[in-house]
Amino acid sequence: MSSGANITYASRKRRKPVQKTVKPIPAEGIKSNPSKRHRDRLNTELDRLASLLPFPQDVINKLDKLSVLRLSVSYLRAKSFFDVALKSTPADRNGGQDQCRAQIRDWQDLQEGEFLLQALNGFVLVVTADALVFYASSTIQDYLGFQQSDVIHQSVYELIHTEDRAEFQRQLHWALNPDSAQGVDEAHGPPQAAVYYTPDQLPPENASFMERCFRCRLRCLLDNSSGFLAMNFQGRLKYLHGQNKKGKDGALLPPQLALFAIATPLQPPSILEIRTKNFIFRTKHKLDFTPIGCDAKGQLILGYTEVELCTRGSGYQFIHAADMLHCAESHIRMIKTGESGMTVFRLLAKHSRWRWVQSNARLIYRNGRPDYIIATQRPLTDEEGREHLQKRSTSLPFMFATGEAVLYEISSPFSPIMDPLPIRTKSNTSRKDWAPQSTPSKDSFHPSSLMSALIQQDESIYLCPPSSPAPLDSHFLMGSVSKCGSWQDSFAAAGSEAALKHEQIGHAQDVNLALSGGPSELFPDNKNNDLYNIMRNLGIDFEDIRSMQNEEFFRTDSTAAGEVDFKDIDITDEILTYVQDSLNNSTLMNSACQQQPVTQHLSCMLQERLQLEQQQQLQQPPPQALEPQQQLCQMVCPQQDLGPKHTQINGTFASWNPTPPVSFNCPQQELKHYQLFSSLQGTAQEFPYKPEVDSVPYTQNFAPCNQPLLPEHSKSVQLDFPGRDFEPSLHPTTSNLDFVSCLQVPENQSHGINSQSAMVSPQAYYAGAMSMYQCQPGPQRTPVDQTQYSSEIPGSQAFLSKVQSRGVFNETYSSDLSSIDHAVQTTGHLHHLAEARPLPDISHLVGSCSSHARMKFIQEQDTGTVRVGHQYTFSKTDFDSCI
């Protein structure tokens, strides 16, 4: 295998060189030169032969002499093949040529072959047994970039990748086994020798193994390719008739096999590529870019007929103002170099539509002089066009033509005499009045200049996208007026406040009043009226106006009917009120149901512990006799307001300071841990918290219960003191909210259990609201005067009797004195009578103890626990220690 540097691929063929300027004939006449006359005759015959080729004129003009001869031979061979292949029987091959030619002339009027090639996703390729391209369709240019004239009668190996040439040669052989002597030179391409077969050696043409389907890579010159394009070849081997080739001995060779295949890209094209391939069109222009011709695709895309396109004058009239200078630069480059290069700009299509195209223009010469311009346009999408526009240079010559200044009627840096699209100051002025005053006449500029082309453009093409013209007959206008007149009164009754609130209502009302005057007042000149032109340019018709009026009608009618606008509604207060009512209406039973299951499992453990302590206490002698139970009603009178005096409860004196009751809502405080049950080791309990409002009405059942006497405790502390000798606490007074913040614990908060505290079992309890001062530890004064509660002393205890300010008191409490060393709770059960009555107001019962705790509470009778804030249960001894 030879090196890659020596491998040659097909490239663009050389073009016809530019001829020198013809020198003037001297006065003495033409000198006789046989060689010069021979060359002139040869050139004349070649030009006449080239004119007979079935190619466009722009292709013929760039062909050199060798290309003209090559294509002429190829055309003659193709014609001979069709002369034989189109005949039905061998008998007609001699005498039926005239009839066949007549049929071909009739078929020339039908261009279905061209349409089939356009619809085909690929191109047609015919390759002979000696690897020459016998025929290639014109659509090969869309896939490989080569023109049809560049590949016909050329070696196919120049188009095939070196690694795929052997496979392509194998597919050309009828037995897929080419002769080893017939090798392929990878450096030059064509085979070393050709092998011809007789009909006896070849299989029938319709044999199944004559079909071919394979893949190989072909040379591609398009910009979107990496150099090669993978193609799929599908076809079969057929006999190539009418070639009349002769062997080395001069004998006529029989027809040989050739590959007739359709080459399609291996990767299916995208939708954009399909659209682009199908809409590539070409236009023909003069040297000043005046259009003189357009193909069928161009007429389909732009919408113009060839007459409309060629009678407008300069081609710059079809170019967007923002792209004129950019195209002029490419135009000058084409005049100098012969090709403009890829240029992206906007073309004006029919019905004031702009189409982005990518164009490449070439200069065509005739007789050594530039004759005309051939431009190939490829349509682009709007997104692609905007991308190219952003990449374009925005220097000063393009500042006025970018579209932001002139096209949308914003102030421009040019003087008024150079402004092609002046600003319209009066909308009610007809075009005949203002055009001569602010716009220079087109006669002031050269007809082929850019300014003249810009002036000749219609102003409306730069204002907005086009829309279908609205029907402006009198019947349509009167129908619109009759439909709109029924709600004019209700619209006027809406008031000035609604008009100020919705600005568009005023505009709709003005249009409605204008329509009420009739079509004669609105459009006196119909289509020549200036208002109609503005509406047409803006894409607004009467159907849009009617829709706007209907929308404003429904909006105004609902406002006039007394409905409140949603924007004026402040729902903050309503939301807060709803939340507060929901909290106030929450039932107290939910709290009871939630608290009881949490500590139900602790009751059994507590009872066992209490029984054990009772057995230990019975073994010790009692220090003193227990006092009989006393009624709480003997201490407090429900009809009397308590003053600043001492009250004795079960032999215990406490100082009560009357203060007005404070109602509060419990704010969410930071998490705090409280060791409430110190008698149990290693047990945790969760106390869910839900804020309650102390103003919720509720009922409470009171029933007498039989409570056993408390067990006897240590004799170290005696709590019966005279009330007058009771000394007030020396601790500073705190706020009512301090203890509330202490009690509030978020839901599902785990608390550690202090083994030194007493454990209680939750039973049926009474719900109530409570506020108290936070219990603060302090030093003990004297054992005789007062027992000070300290959270640090284990087993410190007292008990607290239930206080009721109003109503009948049927509950009795023992006057038994508790010891500091142990904390004992009773295990008796309550026996209530179903009697419900409103809870009396006990908020006036206030007092202060040594720990400065002030509370509103209701105590459980059987377990000695107090329900605080509907969510917290404390032992009786904990509250006793606060008194």
From Swiss-Prot:
PROSITE patterns: BHLH, PAS. Residues 1-9 form a propeptide. Keywords: Activator, ADP-ribosylation, Biological rhythms, Cell cycle, Cytoplasm, DNA-binding, Nucleus, Receptor, Repeat, Repressor, Transcription, Transcription regulation. One of its GO terms (molecular function) is protein heterodimerization activity. Mono-ADP-ribosylated, leading to inhibit transcription activator activity of AHR. InterPro entries: AHR/AHRR, AHR_bHLH, bHLH_dom, HLH_DNA-bd_sf, PAC, PAS, PAS-like_dom_sf, PAS_fold. Residues 436-449 have a biased composition (Polar residues). Residues 37-65 are annotated as: DNA-binding. One of its GO terms (cellular component) is cytoplasm. Residues 1-38, 421-449 are annotated as: Disordered. A motif (Nuclear export signal) lies at residues 63-71. GO terms for biological process: cellular response to 2,3,7,8-tetrachlorodibenzodioxine; cellular response to 3-methylcholanthrene; circadian regulation of gene expression; negative regulation of DNA-templated transcription; negative regulation of T cell mediated immune response to tumor cell; positive regulation of transcription by RNA polymerase II; regulation of adaptive immune response; regulation of DNA-templated transcription. Signal peptide: none annotated. A motif (Nuclear localization signal 1) lies at residues 12-15. Residues 111-175, 266-336 form the PAS domain. Residues 342-383 form the PAC domain. A motif (Nuclear localization signal 2) lies at residues 36-41. Ligand-activated transcription factor that enables cells to adapt to changing conditions by sensing compounds from the environment, diet, microbiome and cellular metabolism, and which plays important roles in development, immunity and cancer. Upon ligand binding, translocates into the nucleus, where it heterodimerizes with ARNT and induces transcription by binding to xenobiotic response elements (XRE). Regulates a variety of biological processes, including angiogenesis, hematopoiesis, drug and lipid metabolism, cell motility and immune modulation. Homodimer. Heterodimer; efficient DNA binding requires dimerization with another bHLH protein. Interacts with ARNT; the heterodimer ARNT:AHR binds to core DNA sequence 5'-TGCGTG-3' within the dioxin response element (DRE) of target gene promoters and activates their transcription. Binds MYBBP1A. Interacts with coactivators including SRC-1, RIP140 and NOCA7, and with the corepressor SMRT. Interacts with NEDD8 and IVNS1ABP. Interacts with BMAL1. Interacts with HSP90AB1. Interacts with TIPARP; leading to mono-ADP-ribosylation of AHR and subsequent inhibition of AHR. This is Aryl hydrocarbon receptor. It comes from Mus musculus molossinus (Japanese house mouse). The lineage of its organism: Eukaryota, Metazoa, Chordata, Craniata, Vertebrata.
